[in-house]
Amino acid sequence: MPHIQPPILSQVPVIAAVCEPAIALTKERQSLKIEGSVTSKNFAMTGVAGYIAPRHLKAIVDTGSRLVAAMDPHDAVGILDRYSFDVRFFTEFERFDRHLEKLRRGPSGDRIDFLTVCSPNYLHDAHIRLALRIGADAICEKPLVINPWNLDALVELERETGRRVHTVLQLRLHPSLVALKQRLGASEHRHTVSLTYVTSRGRWYDVSWKGSADRSGGIATNIGIHFFDLLLWLFGPVTDSEVHLSDSGRMAGHLELERATVRWFLSTDRGDLPFAPQPGGKTTYRSITIDGEEVEFTEGFTDLHTQVYERVLAGEGFGIADARPSIELAYQIRHAKVTAPRISPHPLLA
């Protein structure tokens, strides 16, 4: 293991004084003007009945666009009426596909410009391919794919169709985290990081697609992918990785990144919460510490999806190359053998 110098926080004010640049960045994004925004873009969506879909529905409307068609095998989609009474809705993928193809062959003003993918993880790349095939860009929730080699086919399809695949890496736009990255970038010191994320789930979770590693990618992908992307974005690529715990509901390990040593712990087990959860109450605990100091970013999430859409429409969205490192890391973690820790493990394993 390489020698790790003790962190010197006084030389790197990582956590403190982030407000001023964060506010400036927020104002900059809020003032971002989308060229050509006078022309409303046509959107379609898969997975419109799902948990994350409302954030995308709001982002579509907030950016002056309109949803013209949506699909989900579940028909509890009354939320559509908050935004439009005219959305064509389908419960069968084949009929949805046929409708989008009909629009593609019709007047140019009716064609789909963007297909938003909010479906289960294992369907993401298939629905992205639909977008590219009908001449639309795709905006896809994390992860773009479960297995990293499927990214290569999407890169080829981008080249063949001239369309783009965009992913949603909204934490990279969070003002406090943007300011934190700027401050970290000014230092050559290595940092000691602890990541703890416990989001308790009931018995339904194991029955749903989310509880199936083949369909969700397991918890490293399903609940960990956005944190792994954040860590790689802040501290650079992986140089070493260990997995100390791996089962269907809990994973933990150690990462050596270019500029940090990371101990991480992910869980859907309510027994790992530092408090006693109650149905309908708080059921999630999230903590990231850098050199022993907590990173505070519990606020500021309300319009991050809208900011993602603004940047996509301005030609500045996150693409396949941005998503690849965290997808590869989550895949490696999912398939890694459990080993004894070579350094002190995460505190919840100690």
Show where each model-derived region lies.
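Rossmann-like dinucleotide-binding domain that binds NAD(P)(H)
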Residues: 203-272, 324-328
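Beta-loop-alpha module in the N-terminal Rossmann-like domain of NAD(P)-dependent dehydrogenases
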Residues: 56, 89-139, 143-155
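C-terminal helix-rich "cap/oligomerization" subdomain common to oxidoreductases
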Residues: 19, 25-37, 102-107, 114-116, ...
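A contiguous active-site-proximal alpha/beta segment in oxidoreductase catalytic domains
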Residues: 122, 145-203
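C-terminal substrate-binding/catalytic lobe of Rossmann-fold NAD(P)-dependent oxidoreductases
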Residues: 248-304
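N-terminal Rossmann-like dinucleotide-binding module
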Residues: 19, 25-86
